[in-house]
């Protein structure tokens, strides 16, 4: 053993003079202010030519969302009218607020009762919140179109063929409600959904046409049979009346003669009742 004292390990604690990770957010803010000051100096030096780049005209149906050094500019969407853009540090996006009409491509849909149909629809929508349409989704218009297709397929897939053909307005209202709820977070307002056409397979169309024709023929036969029944009943009642009243028979006889004479025939068959010859037959006997 050495006479030297054994030294204990020394632990080094971080001192207050050691480097601390910088606050990147603070540095970025300072750098942003500096860049903004330089941009203003550049605008002033190049005035009035810089106004050609800084001033933008926004139409009545447009709004502009401005980002300054990556952050949304206070005040929300700008427009309509003239706005001021600082070069180098400002970026902006124009948003059209007009209603967009989108014709949904024909969708092959399997109904609840396993019938494949082709459905066409039209969706009318517009941007209601420009900031949400920029911040919350990459392309609000394209995303709304895709969602419209899937919503139409899902809504019609829960219906039978008969419900599809007879409840178009209810189906359109259901699609509008679902689509409007799905696009609300994107700043899009769905105005209306219309189901244009529901096309059936040719074989099913022919079968339905044959069924409808058979149903029409059956109804026609029923109506004809009911008419014959009513006519027979009327004839029976007339015969009972004539049998009870001989004068009515004579009147009917004269009416028939009048009808024959009105036809201007050269030959007229005059029916004579057998009872008229009864007296002559008795006299001969």
From Swiss-Prot:
Matching Pfam families: Band_7
Keywords assigned by UniProt, alphabetized: Cell junction, Cell membrane, Gap junction, Membrane, Transmembrane, Transmembrane helix
Record GO biological process: positive regulation of cell communication by electrical coupling; response to xenobiotic stimulus
Transmembrane segments: 27-47, 69-89
Variant or mutagenesis effect after changing residue 184 to V: In e580; no effect on unc-9 localization to gap junction in PLM neurons
Coiled-coil intervals: none
GO cellular component terms given for this protein: axon; cell-cell junction; gap junction; plasma membrane
Subcellular location: Cell membrane; Cell junction, Gap junction
Keyword Membrane in record: yes
SUPFAM superfamilies per the UniProt record, alphabetical: Band 7/SPFH domain
The keyword Transmembrane helix belongs to this UniProt entry's keyword annotation: yes
Primary location class: membrane
Membrane topology: Multi-pass membrane protein
GO-annotated molecular function: ion channel regulator activity
Annotated PANTHER family: BAND 7 PROTEIN-RELATED, PROTEIN UNC-1
Family the UniProt entry places it in: Belongs to the band 7/mec-2 family.
Protein's name in the database: Protein unc-1
Organism: Caenorhabditis elegans
């Amino acid at each position: 053993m050495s006479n030297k004292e054994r030294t204990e390990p020394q632990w080094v604690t971080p001192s207050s003079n050691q480097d601390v990770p910088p606050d990147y957010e603070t540095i970025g803010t300072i750098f942003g202010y500096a860049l903004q000051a330089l941009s203003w100096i550049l605008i002033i030096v190049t005035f009035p030519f810089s106004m050609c780049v800084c001033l933008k005209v926004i139409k009545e149906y447009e709004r502009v969302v401005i980002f300054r050094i990556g952050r949304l500019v206070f005040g929300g969407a700008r427009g309509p009218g003239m706005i001021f853009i600082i070069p180098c540090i400002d970026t902006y996006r124009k948003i059209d607020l007009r209603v967009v009409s989108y014709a949904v491509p024909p969708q092959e849909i399997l109904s609840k009762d396993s019938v494949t149909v082709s459905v066409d629809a039209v969706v009318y929508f517009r941007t209601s919140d420009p900031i949400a349409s920029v911040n919350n989704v990459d392309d609000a218009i394209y995303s709304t179109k895709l969602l419209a297709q899937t919503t139409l397929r899902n809504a019609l897939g829960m219906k039978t063929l008969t419900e599809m053909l007879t409840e178009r307005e209810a189906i359109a209202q259901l699609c509008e409600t679902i689509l409007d709820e799905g696009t609300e977070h994107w700043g899009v307002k769905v105005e209306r959904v219309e189901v244009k056409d529901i096309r059936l397979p040719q074989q099913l169309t022919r079968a339905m046409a044959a069924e409808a024709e058979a149903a029409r023929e059956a109804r026609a036969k029923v109506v004809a049979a009911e008419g014959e029944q009513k006519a027979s009943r009327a004839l029976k009642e007339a015969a009972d009346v004539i049998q009870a009243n001989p004068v009515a028979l004579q009147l009917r006889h004269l009416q028939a003669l009048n009808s024959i004479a009105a036809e201007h025939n050269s030959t007229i068959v005059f029916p004579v009742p057998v009872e008229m010859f009864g007296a002559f037959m008795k006299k001969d006997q």
